Every structure is written in structure tokens, then in C-alpha cells.
Amino acid sequence: MIRQAIAKVVELRDLSEGEMIEVMNQIMSGECTPAQIGSFITALRMKGETIAEISGAARVMRERATPIRVGRNVLDIDRDDINLDQETILDVVGTGGDGTNTFNISTTVSFIVSACGVKVAKHGNRSVSSACGSADVLEKLGVNLDVTPEQVERCINEIGIGFLFAPALHGAMKHAIGPRREIGIRTIFNILGPLTNPANADCQVMGVYREELVAKMAGVLHHLGCKRGFVVHGRDGMDEITLTGETAAAEVSPEGVRLFTITPEEFGFSRCSMQALKGGDAVANAAIVRAVLGGEPGPRREIVLLNAGFALLAAGRCATVAAGIDLAAQAIDSGAALMQIEKLATLTN
């Protein structure tokens, strides 16, 4: 099948979702040669991946991932402003590859959101776009990445947050590692990570490295049945909601996709320079995460609050972004968010 798929894609013809599923199953079963894999993902990149193609690939990766089973039968009753719903699982994740070298914003947000009563399955890896990926900073915060799926499940169920280390849970990806490394360009695999959470997170805030991906990835999330989510791209290049200017965004719901723009001012924040959000290596970024969760004021706190507000809205923990920002601030100022780091470190060691 992959030879026929390559022949079709080099003629700039799209694959159906079913065809993509067939090809991805071949790749992840080890049935394709490195040359075939490299040719296929390069041709797909040159043509441009469609929603159907990305969705098909994501379905296969989800099916082949080691599952993380999280209890969803608990009702969150600490809400009086929205309807009660079955407990949701949230992921706050970026594609990486934005090249901005900011501190670990989505990881910091994950601790805050979990302190607000939302179960967070943080899916991540080592560095892509900076000197420090989510896995790198978590190690320096004392979190053990070498844990079993059962330990990850226990973390999420008991303290509300667990880290899903992608290489440990996507074993079938090993067949694509060599071709990806050797061709050295961004391919469909660079955008599949945020779509393939092994805990089947049904709510999500996803950052992407190019604005053209906002609507496309939102379309994929909608197609894959995301309960509620936001796809964002800071127009300064960040794969987060930025404080330096505007953010292109899409809201995903069962009804469809809504495109809109976010500005810091609409939520009471001042714009800042990119320099104010810069990070460093894993040791430096771990210190920044602790400082922000310890109550340090300034742009780092504000960008984390803004992103957390949208994450809490996606998870149904609040009715508005403004209410989510208030909840996030309370989680920091009470010490609850910082305590989540210690709980996760203790439970994984």
C-alpha cells in the first residue's frame, strides 16, 4: 500500500482517511523500508497534509499507544455556574518547533490546572524547540520519568496530574525514528504528538508552530471527537497564547470550530517583550517554574494565568476565561499549585 500511496501523493492527490490508516499501520508494524517511510512523509509534507490524513494517522497512533486508563466516573461537584458533567481529562501541549526558547509555559499551566481540581494527563517529550522540553524540566523538578503505565494512572487518579512520556508509550514509533532524523525536516510526525495522548484526553489546549495549522488542527480535533479545546498560535511565533501581541486561536466543540483572536488587553494584561518570557536550560527553567508557582509577579506569571484560564475553560472548570484566570491565581497564591510538584515527585520516586 505504501508504494501506491507514495505514487498518489507525489501527484499531489490526497489520501482518504482509510488509506492513511492502512499506510500508518504498515509503517508502525515495521513493514516499510526506511526509504519508503522517508519518501512518503516528505511527499506528504510537500503536498500538504489534510485533515483526513492527519486524523487517520492519529487514530493509528492512538490505537497502538500503551493505554493510560484514568477513572472518569467521578463527578466534579464544586461548581455552581455550569452544568455538572462526567469528569474530563485535560492535556495542555504544544507541537514544539516554534524556536522561541521560552520557559516551560504549558508544563507550569498543567500544575496550576491540576491544583484547581482538573485531571491532567500531560503528554510530552524532551526538547524540540528549546533547550528544555517538558520531560527535561520535570526531571529537574524531581519527577521520575521511568515509571510504569500503572504508576502514571495512579498519579492522575490520586493527585490529579501525571506525565505521559511519549517515547515510553509510543513504542511502534521506533520504525519512523531513523527516517525522520535522517531527512531532518518537519513532517506529519511533528504534529501528531499532541493528537495522540495515551490517556485519551478529551479536552485540550494545543499550541502549534505555524498559524496555518490553527484551523487545520482544530478541524482534526473536532473530527476525532474532542469534547472541548483550543488550538493557539502566538503571532510572535509561540506555540502558546502569548503576551507580546495577538494570538490566532480556534475553539473546538461538538458543534464545530470557531476561529478568533486573543489579545492580552481583553483579559487585563499588559503586553511584554519576548525577552521577558525567555527560558534557559532545564535547571534554569525548573527554577523559573518554581518561582512562578511560588508567587513571583510579572510577565511570566501573567502568561501562565492567561493560558491556564483557557485550559480551565476547556476542561469545564469555569464558565469564562476571566473566571479561570481568577481560579488559577488562587491556586498559585494558596500554594496549591506548587504543592503539586512535590506530590508528583513523591509519587513517582
Curated annotation (Swiss-Prot):
Q: What is its EC number?
A: 2.4.2.18
Substrates-to-products reaction catalysed: N-(5-phospho-beta-D-ribosyl)anthranilate + diphosphate = 5-phospho-alpha-D-ribose 1-diphosphate + anthranilate
Q: What's the domain of life for this entry?
A: Bacteria
- Give binding positions for anthranilate 2: R180
Residues bound to 5-phospho-alpha-D-ribose 1-diphosphate are 94, 97-98, 102, 104-107, 122-130, 134
- Gene Ontology CC, one term: cytosol
Classification via NCBIfam families: trpD
Q: What functional role does this protein have?
A: Catalyzes the transfer of the phosphoribosyl group of 5-phosphorylribose-1-pyrophosphate (PRPP) to anthranilate to yield N-(5'-phosphoribosyl)-anthranilate (PRA).
Could you tell me what this protein is called?
Anthranilate phosphoribosyltransferase
Per the record, the gene is trpD
